[in-house]
Amino acid sequence: MIIVTGGAGMIGSNIVKSLNNKGFNDILVVDNLKDGKKFKNLVDLDITDYMDKEDFITQIMAGDDFGPIEAIFHEGACSATTEWDGKYIMMNNYEYSKELLHFCIEREIPFLYASSAATYGETDTFIEERAYEGALNVYGYSKQQFDNYVRRLWADAEEHNETLSQITGFRYFNVYGPREQHKGSMASVAFHLNNQMNAGDNPKLFEGSDEFKRDFVYVGDVAAVNLWFLENGVSGIYNCGTGRAEPFRAVAEAVIKHHGKGEVETIPFPEHLKGAYQEFTQADLTKLRAAGCDVEFKSVADGVAEYMAMINK
């Protein structure tokens, strides 16, 4: 069995879909379906069982037997960069992750987890090293601190000549693609611009967006990276992005091209995002490629075109 936490979410459900495509369906999805709309991400997936995230962690902490587990993909988290309840974020993203990590280490179960490019903050160097990290929001900090916790475990194991089972973290950059319709304000720019155009409006970008560039990565490619690392058993913390920074306007132009009409309009930059907003991200893929991962990443033009074709059927 493979367990996918956050399996009803965007990245988690795409990982499940990719596993299904490879013929694997002995999958336990763990999530919180309080927002019942997320069920739509599971309807076309072939899984063995579903469990609420609180029931799951209770059983994990009790050391319950789940039977043979081939791997755990830990994608579950509060991913809202606008959430400032630090106690909630640290309990949900940090403490929960630690419990699950130690469960896996004790049983030598491969543990592949979601980190984030939000760990880097305001920098122009995106290398998986402590010197380049400086989260701008509490979500980013929760991910940064868990990465540091994992690093400490590796250092302790090395000091005692021990080898830990596989632990792999992925610093996701700006992920977009199918199965994100439940995310509300945290859905991708492509998703929001498409909704605007379907409502008969022009696509709207924040003022100053011509200066903002992000590494926009297609969720299908993200899922492929996760499966590559499981199949190859490689540990480490790795950037998961295209290695290219593209302007928000490139996303808007790809959406406009699909619809065959429209022009970009600008709206004021939100006050609540000032000082907590990454204006530039670009994954350094040196470490990912050195590990042997050869997954090719779609450009914004190609990825958004594929995405638009899927959600505008």
UniProtKB/Swiss-Prot annotation:
It catalyses: ADP-D-glycero-beta-D-manno-heptose = ADP-L-glycero-beta-D-manno-heptose. SUPFAM superfamilies: NAD(P)-binding Rossmann-fold domains. The active site is at residues 139, 183. Keywords: Carbohydrate metabolism, Isomerase, NADP. InterPro entries: Epimerase_deHydtase, Heptose_epim, NAD(P)-bd_dom_sf. PANTHER family: ADP-L-GLYCERO-D-MANNO-HEPTOSE-6-EPIMERASE, NUCLEOSIDE-DIPHOSPHATE-SUGAR EPIMERASE. Contains a large N-terminal NADP-binding domain, and a smaller C-terminal substrate-binding domain. Belongs to the NAD(P)-dependent epimerase/dehydratase family. HldD subfamily. This is ADP-L-glycero-D-manno-heptose-6-epimerase. It comes from Aliivibrio fischeri (strain ATCC 700601 / ES114). The gene is hldD.
